[in-house]
Amino acid sequence: GPASYEAPMGEIHGEVASKWQYKIRNGKMIYEFESDVKIDDEILKAELGSNGEVQLKNIIRTIQKEQNAIIRNTKDRIMVIQGAAGSGKTSVALHRIAYLLYHDRQNLKSSNILILSPNGVFSDYISHILPELGEENIKEMSFDLFAYRQLKDTVSDCEDRYDQIERSLNFPDMPSLYKEKQSREFLNRMEGYLTSLEDELMDFHDVEYKSFTKKEEEIIDLFYFKFQDIPLLSRMEAVAENFIDEVETLRDNDMDEEERAIVMEKFMNMYETQDLYVIYSRFLESCGYPGLPHVQLQERKLRYEDVYPVLYMKYRLLRQTSHNGIKHLVVDEMQDYSRLQYLILKMMFPCRMTILGDKAQTMEDEAQDVLGFLPKIFGKEIRRIVMNKSYRNTVEIASYANQLAGITDMD
């Protein structure tokens, strides 16, 4: 297609008819080959640059064509890639990030991308490719670390997935509640409990400040009607701001910070508690589970099975600072995320996503039907892609591995 570049004599325009990769050492051509996309595998580059079989080169070009269509897809908002081991899904996702940064460089910067991955494969690649695009490194972390950072004002520590697995192995007789607390039934019970909090958590009364009064009836009306769309634990703040606006209008001058704090405290004290840890513990007890230990903040540690239910509850009860700065989210190892975790991701990140993984590499006892429930969460915005051809192994090895894993849809 058409292209241009800056030169000392001005901008040069032309047409890119083909792309070639070269390796030259000490004035000697090591290899050269035509390629639609950048290839980083040294063995593959050497093979393509040799006088090898035409069939191999045709196969590689076919692979490139299929993968290139995924890399350059800018139409679908949520792209989900189920890829077998050796199918090239990680390479596709990496090149997709680079392509999107280049294609939409006016609106998308490396700071607008977040990668949730339990390993460093993405950052290793990106640290090499992004300098070529003039970009800084992209933020990458595990979802467990991200969740802990969101909850550090509620607890002092959170168990991660690997610690939870190790605990299960060391104490096999201890019942695991992870699946129960990630289930749809558990979430439905939580939603019912959150609805009941609308009344149970509140103790309404008149508010007086100097010569100004806000009657209980008016507070209730504002709380349950005018501001009903605001999350429960953030709603009274809106009611207080309404009162502050009225006072400032009537006396024709603004409150100072100390006055605002006094008024805000009067309104916020109508909550029986605002402690998310306490609220979740009471919810557990209402469901017949043991409550959380009654300890101070610095001693609070959540088990892994409770981390994401608490995070979900936080996003339902409190108005959150949105992550609008993140315009593209990459989720690696999608097979290890629960339905609840995807619901949280949808709430936290109203942006484009690339989600990838392999159901055969799950850490769970049995593979989840991630491709089945994701459309129910994200709706019609999702595009599912299955890469079931493995290019890493011989036919014999792949066939034997498929038999062991009970996989029938991988070539």
Predicted regions, residues:
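P-loop NTPase Walker
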Residues: I39-D163
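Short glycine/proline-rich turn/loop motifs
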Residues: D41-L48, L292-V295, E381-R383
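Inter-lobe coupling/hinge region of RecA-like P-loop helicase motors
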Residues: N51, R72, D76-A85, E166-Y178, ...
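Active-site-adjacent beta-strand anchor residues
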Residues: I115-L116, L233, M387
